[in-house]
A protein has these predicted regions:
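A generic secondary-structure micro-motif detector
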Residues: 14, 61, 145, 166-167
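Beta-strand-loop-alpha "switch" segments that mediate conformational coupling across diverse proteins
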Residues: 162-170
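A short secondary-structure junction signal
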Residues: 94, 144-150, 175-177
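A short, flexible beta-alpha/helix-coil linker loop
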Residues: 9-11, 139-142, 170-173
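N-terminal beta1-alpha1-beta2 submodule of the flavodoxin-like/Rossmannoid cofactor-binding fold
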Residues: 1-111, 175, 183-229
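Short, glycine-/small-residue-rich phosphate/pyrophosphate-handling segment
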Residues: 108-162
Length: 229
């Protein structure tokens, strides 16, 4: 399986969320070897979309000559694309948002209406190789409610049918002292990856397990605030 991980964390390799993503990928590896490419978006030259829409009229060629051209090729050559990022202002970091916006060349100017009444642009490139799109997002708050909703809804609209994993308390993945609480979650994420590799989806019970807080939110908040009681 050819997998592309777009790491949107400004921390790059030090990303908290990347620990989550790699545990999931380790589980997928149990079902068979995968060809995984990780792109650290913060290290690439990706300008913001200028909204000229030339790409929708010339067959999908962006006028901006930067690293996004290579990333678009990597997306189209992949079977699974994972957007891995920390929650920033209830959305995604700006560099990764540039990537999403710069996917504009994949679709044409022509609009189509789906069975739910939603309009979108018709694809103008072959995306048949791409089987799954996934969002893996961590956040520094101790609960999911009132935090992930904006990012989740944006992803649902942009990539209907995608798999979405949201994990609160994600800074714990980079804290050695939190290992007793983190280890069971990493094991659960690995198990979830194996499930996804086998079924192409995650059951609600699995999602509930991997997306729940690792420790009670009140205790997490105390530690995050520097309190020791």
């Amino acid at each position: 399986m050819k997998i592309l991980v777009l790491n949107g964390s400004p921390k790059g390799e030090r990303s908290d969320t990347l620990h989550i993503t790699r545990a999931f990928l380790a589980g997928m590896e149990e079902a068979g070897p995968n060809d995984v490419t990780t792109v650290h978006v913060n290290e690439r030259n990706i300008a913001f979309c200028t909204g000229c829409f030339v790409c929708k009229k010339n067959g999908g060629v962006c006028v901006l000559e930067d690293d996004m051209r290579e990333i678009l090729e990597q997306i189209l050559a992949s079977e699974i694309v994972i957007f891995s990022f920390p929650l920033y202002s209830y959305g995604m970091p700006g560099a990764l948002k540039n990537v999403i916006d710069r996917m504009m060349p994949l679709s044409s100017w022509n609009m189509v209406r789906d069975e739910k009444g939603k309009y979108g642009h018709r694809m103008q490139v072959d995306v048949s190789r791409l089987r799954h799109i996934m969002m893996i997002c961590g956040c520094g708050f101790p609960n999911s409610k009132h935090n992930f909703e904006g990012a989740v809804r944006q992803f649902e609209l942009k990539f209907p049918g995608s798999t979405i994993v949201t994990v609160p308390e994600s800074p714990m993945f980079n804290i050695p002292q939190a290992a007793p609480f983190v280890a069971p979650r990493l094991a659960a994420l690995k198990k979830a990856g194996a499930e996804f590799a086998a079924a192409g989806a995650l059951c609600p019970e699995t999602l509930a397990d991997i997306c729940s807080p690792m420790i009670p939110e009140e205790i997490y908040a105390q530690f995050a605030n520097g309190e020791r009681t």
